[in-house]
Design a protein with these regions (language model features):
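Conserved hydrophobic beta-strand signature of PAS-family and PAS-like sensory domains
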Residues: 82, 90-92, 195, 202-205
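Conserved beta-strands of PAS-like sensory domains
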Residues: 147-179
Length: 210
């Protein structure tokens, strides 16, 4: 009987760990799909403005119309926004730091030495659907601290621009963690079998017994 209990416990634990690993891997997939969707919406807007306005206005006016159309847009509970850079590494639109707009900064780095702008420019040269770049960027509520971020960009040929959006990976991981805990909370096996989850510091995160 004891051996059967141990085998059942091992099976349940293996199943829970497999679900955790599946969800962890899915987090990146979900974020990538969402970023692509956001940028595709922006590109439709940009292409429509360009097609309509370039017939009656000079390029500089059309650029300004596009920039100001994207500037106020927010998503991901206010964290997400659209940005535009040119392919030489100049900030064209950066709603969180408009003082940088117009500045040529091809060598800007994150706190781990990654070349942010160069990574975005390289990503913009990839085929549609592949233009992802990972880097670290300043947190909205902690302007002197950086955190991991993923961006997706597309190339806009008429102005030699890249247009993109990104988000910090931590909120997406936390969202998936909560989904995992809710799923495991409902698990019951045998007459009194429950699953308990704790963090590295021993704090109880969830027990399906309560």
């Amino acid at each position: 009987l004891r051996a059967q209990q141990q085998e059942r416990l091992q099976r349940e634990l293996d199943s829970a760990i497999s679900f955790l690993e599946f969800t962890r891997q899915r987090t990146d997939t979900v974020l990538r799909a969402s970023l692509r969707e956001q940028v595709d919406v922006a590109m439709q807007m940009v292409q429509a403005i360009h097609a309509r306005e370039s017939q009656r206005h000079p390029p500089e006016v059309v650029k300004r119309l596009i920039i100001e159309a994207l500037r106020p847009v927010r998503f991901y509970q206010g964290r997400g926004y659209y940005f535009i850079d040119d392919m030489q590494g100049r900030f064209i639109l950066l709603p969180t730091a408009p003082q940088l707009e117009g500045r040529l900064l091809p060598d800007n780095q994150d706190d781990r030495g990654h070349m942010i702008m160069r990574g975005l420019v390289e990503a913009a040269r990839l085929p549609d659907g592949q233009g992802f770049s990972s880097y670290r960027w300043y947190l909205p509520d902690k302007p002197n601290e950086m955190a991991d971020k993923l961006a997706y960009v597309r190339y806009f040929a008429p102005f030699d621009w890249l247009i993109g959006a990104g988000d910090y990976t931590a909120p997406w991981e936390q969202q998936q963690q909560q989904a995992v805990l809710e799923r495991l909370r409902a698990v019951r096996f045998g007459q009194s079998g429950v699953i308990t989850v704790a963090d590295h510091d021993g704090r109880l995160l969830m027990s399906s017994g309560r």
